[in-house]
């Protein structure tokens, strides 16, 4: 990692550690996801890297490169200095209608571009929406670990996403249109920005996953009396929260909805956005690595050299994790089961959900 120097840790998760780093030559700050080599380099990692690399849009975090160290695979991305949209809402309680629209317009433009590129995100939520550090923050979609490409992958049928944001058809465990499920998740994000709470949680029992799922399936929500929003806004939300995805408003229809078009920034108009939709997208690529080079690096990362268990990045793991890796039996072929299926099963069983933290 001679190219970058560590600044500080900025997050962690099941994948490992996210670090803020600085390019030694250009002094540019970047975000680096550090994933331990070995079994953690799974299909989700492949999917995240390949799908993310193909996207070039101002409302999507820029993918830069992947680097292999003796102990970790490093995914280098644009750093968003403004942090998560989730934290901004937690600090403010909720947004005004105009501010919520400002961020929703950017979210829709970013997701619409993903859909144009035949990629559905499948895990849209406030924690996966970042902001840059400008006075009028630019929204940036991140984390494509659960994304799916209709070009590279089959149509999704597995349940995936954070429970509060999951569309009814996803919970049905049947084949569904990932793009329409993304529209639902965008609607949840809009609701939370306006209300400061999740639309389908039981106010008296917000951590009860089963109740949340029941309310999602029956589309049971309401706008509280203390939240004053326009009739057009309420109508848009109602058109998003439709149980039958075939009757749900589409991304194209959202972009022509009167509420969406009000005060639409010039750079988000159809004319300005057209450049990102051309086959010869003139937006410069932020990665010099070819897909073949990237996949070769990722494939190599699936092995953990025994001679390289310690070193510069060893603090991102632990001795116990290393012991686990050594004792781990060969993975069963049943790993073919989609990771998303496992995730929803766990959610149903555990009842864990980060929902109450937004309550006012």
From Swiss-Prot:
A GO cellular component annotation in the UniProt record: nucleus
Active-site annotation: 123 (proton acceptor)
Protein kinase domain span: 4-260
Enzyme class: transferase
EC number, as in UniProt: 2.7.11.1
Region (Disordered): 303-360
Biased composition (Acidic residues): 317-339
Amino-acid positions noted as binding ATP in the UniProt annotation, renumbered to this chain: 10-18, 33
Modification after translation, per record: May be phosphorylated.
Conditions for induction: By hyperosmotic stress and abscisic acid (ABA) in leaf blades.
Tissue expression: Expressed in leaf blades, leaf sheaths and roots. Expressed in shoots and roots of young seedlings.
Catalytic activity: L-seryl-[protein] + ATP = O-phospho-L-seryl-[protein] + ADP + H(+); L-threonyl-[protein] + ATP = O-phospho-L-threonyl-[protein] + ADP + H(+)
Gene3D superfamilies xref list: Phosphorylase Kinase, domain 1 (3.30.200.20), Transferase(Phosphotransferase) domain 1 (1.10.510.10)
Superkingdom assignment: Eukaryota
Stretches with biased composition (Basic and acidic residues): 340-351
Record entry for activity regulation: Activated by hyperosmotic stress.
Keywords recorded for this protein, A-Z: Abscisic acid signaling pathway, ATP-binding, Kinase, Nucleotide-binding, Phosphoprotein, Serine/threonine-protein kinase, Stress response, Transferase
GO molecular function: ATP binding; protein serine kinase activity; protein serine/threonine kinase activity
GO biological process: abscisic acid-activated signaling pathway
PANTHER family, A to Z: SERINE/THREONINE KINASE, SERINE_THREONINE-PROTEIN KINASE SAPK4
Stated role: May play a role in signal transduction of hyperosmotic response.
Protein family (similarity comment): Belongs to the protein kinase superfamily. Ser/Thr protein kinase family.
Protein name (database record): Serine/threonine-protein kinase SAPK4
Organism: Oryza sativa subsp. japonica (Rice)
Phylogenetic lineage: Eukaryota, Viridiplantae, Streptophyta, Embryophyta, Tracheophyta
């Amino acid at each position: 990692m001679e190219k970058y120097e560590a600044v500080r840790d900025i997050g962690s998760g099941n994948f490992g550690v996210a670090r803020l780093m600085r390019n030694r030559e250009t002094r540019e700050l970047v975000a680096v996801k550090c994933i331990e080599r070995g079994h953690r380099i799974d299909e989700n990692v492949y999917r995240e890297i390949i799908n993310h690399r193909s996207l070039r849009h101002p409302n999507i975090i820029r993918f830069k490169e992947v680097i292999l160290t003796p102990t970790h695979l490093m995914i280098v991305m644009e750093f968003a200095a403004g942090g998560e949209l989730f934290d901004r809402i937690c600090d403010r309680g909720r947004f005004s209608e105009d501010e919520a629209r400002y961020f929703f317009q950017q979210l829709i433009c970013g997701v619409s571009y993903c859909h144009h590129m035949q990629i559905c995100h499948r895990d849209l939520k406030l924690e996966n929406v970042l902001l840059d550090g400008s006075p009028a923050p630019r929204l940036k979609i991140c984390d494509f670990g659960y994304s799916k490409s209709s070009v590279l992958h089959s149509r999704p049928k597995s349940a995936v996403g954070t429970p509060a944001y999951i569309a009814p058809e996803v919970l049905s465990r049947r084949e569904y249109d990932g793009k329409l499920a993304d529209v639902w998740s965008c609607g949840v994000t809009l609701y939370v920005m306006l209300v400061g709470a999740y639309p389908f949680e039981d106010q008296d029992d917000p951590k009860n996953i089963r109740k949340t799922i029941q309310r999602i399936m029956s589309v049971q929500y309401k706008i509280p009396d203390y939240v004053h929003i326009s009739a057009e806004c309420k109508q848009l939300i109602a058109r998003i929260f439709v149980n039958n995805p075939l009757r749900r408003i589409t991304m194209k229809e959202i972009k022509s909805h009167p509420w969406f078009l009000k005060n639409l920034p010039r750079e988000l108009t159809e004319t300005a956005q057209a450049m990102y939709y051309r086959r010869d997208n003139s937006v410069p690529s932020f990665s010099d690595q070819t897909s073949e080079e990237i996949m070769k690096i990722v494939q190599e990362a699936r092995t953990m050299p025994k001679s390289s268990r310690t070193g510069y990045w060893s603090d991102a793991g632990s001795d116990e994790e290393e012991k686990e890796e050594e004792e781990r039996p060969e993975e069963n072929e049943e790993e073919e089961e989609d990771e998303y299926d496992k995730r929803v099963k766990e959610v149903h069983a555990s009842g864990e959900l980060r929902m109450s933290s937004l309550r006012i």
